[in-house]
Amino acid sequence: MKERSIFSRIKQTCILLALLTTTICQAQNVSNLPVPAPHQLKWHEAELGVVFHYDLHVFDGQIYGQGNNRINPVEDYNIFNPTQLNTDQWIEAAKAAGAKFAILTATHETGFGLWQSDVNPYCLKAVKWRDGKGDIVRDFVNSCRKYGIQPGIYIGIRWNSLLGIHNFKAEGEGEFARNRQIWYRHLCEKMVTELCTRYGELFMIWFDGGADDPKGMGPDVEPIVNKYQPNCLFYHNVSRADLRWGGSESGTVGYPCWSTFPYPYSHSNATDGVQDHNKLLAHGDPEGLSLIHI
């Protein structure tokens, strides 16, 4: 009886040790997982948002052709002449659809700015509409706050048909192109500063196609956003993405879809070891140590 009792206790002790070891290992594994930053939690809570694309091509009467419009400047920017613009109506419609945030293209592929820029002359100051005093970004943000919608701003610096910027790069060769590239870099940084400092707290800053590499000739925008909009979502550059594109514009993502990712940025086809980047964007990586939500 004593031997049976001793063996029973040894067995119980072994089981307890095994369970304890498993629990410790699981706790260690969990402790290695990334956790969302406070602004990333806001992204989850927001659930549904809308994007308002508004640019010169709204008024040219043509079917939008991205390839041509990226390289051909609009001949007469005074075609921009809305007669019934009502950002309250935009945001009321978004709210009725269940949206909790809204994003406006402050500048898109033409390079035309929808605000009163002091650094980019190609903006609403240049047109006859509202005697050159219109500021649609301000109207939009005010409407968002009026109806309890979180405002975000979309900034397109990858393309600028007026200045001949194609995929972040100034067209041309030699010193001519280099000087224009440096000038454009500084212009972008100044525009981002304006948008980050004039309109109060923003939900998101979205760079169309990213913001290029500041270690090369790209604008160094992340420190600007961090300084003036520390709580907003940043999307994105070559070193940081608080959220990610789903790998296609179909409106769907892969299954399963993980929020974890192998590195803290997205849209990098040059990353070693990645064979199918769009697949990675669609599915994420269950073993990833960075958190980038869709």
Predicted regions mapped to residue ranges:
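A composition/secondary-structure signal for short, hydrophobic, low-basic-content segments
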Residues: 8, 22-24, 49
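Short, basic, low-complexity termini and linkers enriched in Ser/Thr/Gly/Pro
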Residues: 20, 293-294
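Mature catalytic domains of secreted/periplasmic carbohydrate-active enzymes
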Residues: 28-292
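Bacterial N-terminal signal peptides that target proteins for export
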Residues: 2-14
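Bacterial N-terminal signal peptides
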Residues: 13-23
